[in-house]
């Protein structure tokens, strides 16, 4: 099994609907951020990939034929090089509405986990901060214009 579809769109641009649509269209399984609940061991692999370390993509995506959302959308170019026959899908949303949605949902959740007293929540929040918010948006999530420009 190999990746046939790679999503390049950020979370909150319809990626969950896209995941379900791809699966309805016959793509075996579509990797999405929520897959990390079932594969907590993947967190370290994604950290390595985002550092630029070599990653065994076929092992990471074993059983999947598509991927959308974070953490893979950050690496769509590397994935495209590893899977040159895969189709790239870019999901988009009005930037202002997207920013508001992110800040009120997934960023707020990541921040709450990061600030939690519970070690497991802290670890999940730290991972999201490192992989998404700090790496992609330079840790400047409160700077609306900067985030939208990214």
What are these regions (language model features)?
Residues 1-5:
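Extreme N-terminal starter segment of soluble prokaryotic enzymes
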Residues 6-13, 17-149:
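Anion-recognition interface
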């Amino acid at each position: 099994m190999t990746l046939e579809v790679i999503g390049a769109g950020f979370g909150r641009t319809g990626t969950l609907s896209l995941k379900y649509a791809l699966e309805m269209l016959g793509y075996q399984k579509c990797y999405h951020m929520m897959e990390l609940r079932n594969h907590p061991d993947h967190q370290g692999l994604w950290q390595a990939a985002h550092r630029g370390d070599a990653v065994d993509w076929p092992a990471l995506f074993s059983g999947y034929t598509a991927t959308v959302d974070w953490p893979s959308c950050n690496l769509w170019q590397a994935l495209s090089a590893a899977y040159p026959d895969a189709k790239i899908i870019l999901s988009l949303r009005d930037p202002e509405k997207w920013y508001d949605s992110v800040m009120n949902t997934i960023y707020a959740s990541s921040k709450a986990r990061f600030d939690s007293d519970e070690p497991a929540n802290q670890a999940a929040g730290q991972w999201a901060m490192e992989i998404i918010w700090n790496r992609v948006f330079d840790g400047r999530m409160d700077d609306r214009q900067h985030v939208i420009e990214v």
